[in-house]
Amino acid sequence: MYNFSVPDICDEFSDIQIGDLFLNSYGSKNKFFGQIHTAKCEHSNSIVKEFVNEQGEGKVLLIEHTGSELCSMVGDQIAQKAYENKWNGILTNGCIRDVEIIQNIDIGSVSYTHLRAHETQF
């Protein structure tokens, strides 16, 4: 694993964009990087499932969640599948669940936390 710090990267690349500071790290990898692949989701994580079922070596999945904060985009099964297919990490402005399990999966996972599955209807 490469050693790097966010301030050093910002110093070297002045046009870099930094994510929200209130996102939390949940996977066992606190630092991860790779080619970004973006999934835009509203109320279903079906496209996320499609992405993590593909080979992900050297890649990071960025989930742009435009829907309600009352549902999750990532759970333990998706995180496990991403790990099995060698994704470096998952970053989302949406919510995840099963954080107690995800923290033991060797993958980077940065997001908000939520307890409900995406299928929950209100």
Describe the role of every protein-language-model region.
Residues M1-Q35:
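Intrinsically disordered, low-complexity regions enriched in acidic/Ser/Thr/Pro/Gln residues
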Residues S28-F32, V52-G56, Y83-E84, I101-Q103:
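Solvent-exposed alpha-helices and their adjacent loops that cap or buttress functional pockets
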Residues Q35-C41:
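Short amphipathic
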Residues N45-F51:
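Surface-exposed ligand/attachment interfaces on beta-rich extracellular proteins
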Residues F51-K81, N85-N93:
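Extracellular/luminal Protease-associated
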Residues G67-S68, C95-V99, L115:
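Acidic, glycine-rich active-site loops and adjacent beta-strand->loop/helix elements
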Residues Q103-L115:
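Short, hydrophobic/π-rich interface segment
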Residues H114-F122:
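Single conserved hydrophobic/aromatic residue that forms the stacking wall/gate
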